[in-house]
Amino acid sequence: MSLKKLIKQCADNDRKAQEEIYQLFSGKLFSICLKYSKNKQEAQDNFQDGFVTIFEKIGQFKFNGSFEGWMKRVMINTVLLKYRNKTVLNIVTEDIPDEVIVDIDDDEISLDFLLNLIQNLPDRYRMVFNLYVLDGHSHKEISKMLQ
């Protein structure tokens, strides 16, 4: 069945079509939630909320661009919405050195290690990091997203 037909059936609340869309895209979308979340449990909550939003708004997809890109944007916006109303970034008042030297061999850094470091950042810092470094948004765009 074509993706366009699946999308239209999802808009009509066809459960089989929704299940097929879920099976096609759940892996990629969960990885997005994982990178924006503190831990796996929070990622699962964000993932579930994101898919609910996708299926609620799927009728708004206009077939002008990539459906996968649209779903990624909905998923990221769902996660960001949860964090927008949280406390603002705390400004660090202690002296911060101009340069920090870290001596780590590139071969020693694993993907799990990096993911763990990112997940341990405070919520808003993690959001900014992901949006800037991983998704390529400008600081101006990020500022608008987080307002």
Report each predicted region and the residues it spans.
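Internal acidic/polar
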Residues: 81, 88-111, 116
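A short, charge-rich alpha-helical start-of-domain segment used by transcription regulators
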Residues: 7-30
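A short pre-motif secondary-structure segment
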Residues: 128-132
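Arg/Lys-rich amphipathic alpha helix in sigma70-family domain 2
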Residues: 59-63, 73-93
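Short amphipathic alpha-helical boundary/capping segments
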Residues: 5-10, 113-121
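Amphipathic, Lys/Arg- and hydrophobic-enriched alpha-helical face
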Residues: 22-40, 57, 118
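Sigma70-family region 2
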Residues: 11-12, 48-66, 85-86
